[in-house]
Amino acid sequence: MRKLGIPTVVDRTLQQAITQQLVPIYEPLFAEGSYGYHPNRSAKDAILKVKEYAEQGYTFAVVLDLSKYFDTLNHEILINLLRKNVKDERVVQLIKRYLKSGVMVNGVVIDTEEGSPQGGNLSPLLANVYLNEFDQEFLKRGVPCIRYADDIVLLAKSRRASERLLESSTKYLEERLKLTVNREKSRTVSVFAIRNFKFLGFALGRNGKGIYARVHPKSWKKFKSRLKELSSRKRCQSIKPSLEKIKVYARGWLNYYGIASMKNNIDEINGWLYHRIRMCIWKQWKKPRTKYKNLVKLGIPEHYAATIANSRRKYWYISNNKAVIWALNKERLINSGFYDLATAYQSVHVNY
């Protein structure tokens, strides 16, 4: 269970003040390969950097999984690291007090002898300060290291080199930084192994045109599952609010994953989602008389509308009927608020 610090308004203000003082000190000191919690850097930049290295021949990855990273930061090590660059001891002591301020677990506040309480402004910065030691060490060794918070990928040009890296990086993290590496989840893998290489929700692929970023299958599954939930017959009792929720979610998802090559996948999900929305509308019409009236109003011949309206077939089947597709075509659904994934993807992806 994740431990959360619940800072008061005063604590939060103080944390923000300390953070504002430390950011100008540490930003120039952080490694180029660190992407999490930095101004003007993102997860998209991180996966594009992995892609860039892969194009240079670094096609084997060491994927490191840290067990409960934020909860297990060693206070003594962190305070000593801070003292290297923070010359005002009062600031260091304030941070020390913050680290030991306690966290809430199952509604009970417990003392903290290790870890950085999540939920405050300061925690992300301290997490980066701690792992910057790791970043700089492997930078000195000439190893490409890409890190987003506690998601770490080291890159090598051969499997053998990656296996040596897994051993040496695990040793450094556990012995020097007193962290726990999850041995079962940490591994060496080809960056093109779609099932095994997953970084920040992305994977890499290659074809005759070169190397490209793609959405990992698990991320696709989660996306489709959420769309299915938002477009369920229960959720869609009122269609316009449901379309708005789908739009907000899908737009955020595409803004994140828009760098990936996924035209065929998006087209497939887009068609499936249109079908789902037609099904919801068909269910909303409920009575055969209402269905008949609406179909005729939308241009379906009366005799055909009567046959469809009185059909006992299931919603999913009828909503894929040619007449229903024509009556509830893309243009009409878009005018009603449908967020066309294919069009949105094209406008986002063109920037990459």
Question: Which stretches of residues belong to each language-model region?
Answer:
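Non-catalytic, peripheral interaction segments enriched in hydrophobic/basic residues
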Residues: 242-288, 292-296
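Electropositive, glycine- and tryptophan-enriched low-complexity nucleic-acid-binding patches
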Residues: 16, 20-33
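A conserved non-catalytic segment of reverse transcriptases
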Residues: 100, 176-244, 249-251
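Duplex nucleic acid-engaging cores and interfaces of nucleic-acid transaction enzymes
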Residues: 9-15, 19, 47, 51, ...
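Conserved phosphate-binding loops in nucleotide/dinucleotide-binding enzymes
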Residues: 2-8, 209, 213
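Conserved polymerase palm-domain catalytic core
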Residues: 29-191, 196
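Residues immediately flanking
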Residues: 20, 64-66, 157-158, 202, ...
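Extended C-terminal regions of large enzymes
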Residues: 276, 285-352
